A protein has these predicted regions:
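CheY-like receiver
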Residues: 120-141
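Conserved acidic segment of CheY-like receiver
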Residues: 3-15, 20-24, 52
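Active-site residues of response regulator receiver
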Residues: 55
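Short hydrophobic/Thr-rich beta-strand motif most characteristic of the beta2 strand and flanking loop
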Residues: 28-35, 43
Length: 141
């Protein structure tokens, strides 16, 4: 039986979601993709995911709002927000563990996702602690 990290990926753009899903699967993740944030939230109520990867700009519910709902259901699940913007207001990132803006290298995204699903790091209280741990991990490999 495989023991792969299960990622919920929510993006309203089917073309983008197919492309990134393919990349993430090549990197060893098991990806469940939803193009509707309402459907994704319903799935979260009955399924546990190791990590949620959310598009920021979606109709019906923003990625930051979906992040808040996911954290309410499963506070220990890391949430990564991706957006076409290089920065977002801090209020939009309140329930987000990492944010990647336009032009982020895919290897940076994948690396951060791998770090966040490590149980020890998922419990760290702030982004500076995660950054320190990521640096230590990179130095040890």
């Amino acid at each position: 039986m495989e023991n792969r990290t299960t990622v919920l990926y929510v993006d309203d753009n089917p073309k983008s979601s197919r492309l990134l899903t393919s990349v993430l699967e090549e990197c060893g993740f098991r990806v469940i993709t939803k193009n509707d944030p309402i459907e994704a939230l319903a799935l979260c109520q009955r399924t546990y995911f190791d990590l949620a990867l959310l598009d920021y700009e979606m109709p019906l519910m923003s990625g930051s709002r979906l992040a808040e709902e996911i954290k309410f259901l499963a506070p220990d699940v890391p949430v990564v927000l991706i957006s076409g913007r290089s920065s977002l207001p801090s209020a939009e990132l309140a329930f987000v563990d990492a944010h990647f803006g336009f032009g982020t290298a895919l290897d940076d995204l994948v690396w951060t996702m791998r770090i966040l699903v490590q149980p020890k790091l998922a419990r760290m209280p702030d982004h500076r602690a995660i950054q320190r741990a990521m640096t230590q991990w990179a130095d040890s490999t």
